[in-house]
Amino acid sequence: LYGYAQMRATVAKTMVNSKWPGYREDMHGTYQDKQIPNTYSCYGDPAMETLLQYGLKGMRDITGLNLKPTYSYWRLYKTGDVLKRHKDRPSCEVSTTLCLGYNNTNLKGRKNNWEKYDWPMWVDKTGGFNNRGVPINMKPGDMIVYRGCEIEHWREPFLGANHAQVFLHYNNVDGPYGENCVYDGRPHLGLPPAFKS
């Protein structure tokens, strides 16, 4: 090597794909989330996709399943936001929800104890619809692992100022969705939904 080298066609195809300009528009998130309109969310954020990959070994260990990552999605809930009861799509076969942090100081001086306020995620562990459900409280750094396509889950109206939550989704390679949903139809992690095949 004489101080420099030239390499040709070494960039991943996704970097020169015609969809690439859309990446810049999508990478900063949106307020167009259909589940919770006017609330900030971001699909495939590079930092969260790194967390998704980083958590893979632990997820395999805790579930005993041959998992592959599908996608990450994070949301910044605000006062009054509600997550309706639902089950997830096939790319969310094995899901996690991780509490990144929250601000409840807007509750100071109210009847409820704002310092102890947790916003639970409710799960219906029977897998059926419209049963009472079980609340699971989370502090920053806590994570819930659940079967997103089987377990109905929801959140009641949020009372605090804001609450950041990331969802990390995986599929069981040996399960009903197999390899079909790996990377949620994208060529690899770290890309926005415009790259889905």
What are these regions (language model features)?
Residues 60, 64-65, 101-105:
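Short helix-capping and hinge/turn segments at secondary-structure transitions, especially at repeat
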Residues 64-73:
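A short coil-to-beta-strand element that immediately follows conserved catalytic motifs
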Residues 76:
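Conserved active-site beta-strand element of glycosyltransferases/polysaccharide synthases
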Residues 79-150, 154, 162-166, 172-187:
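Catalytic core of non-heme Fe(II) oxygenases with the double-stranded beta-helix
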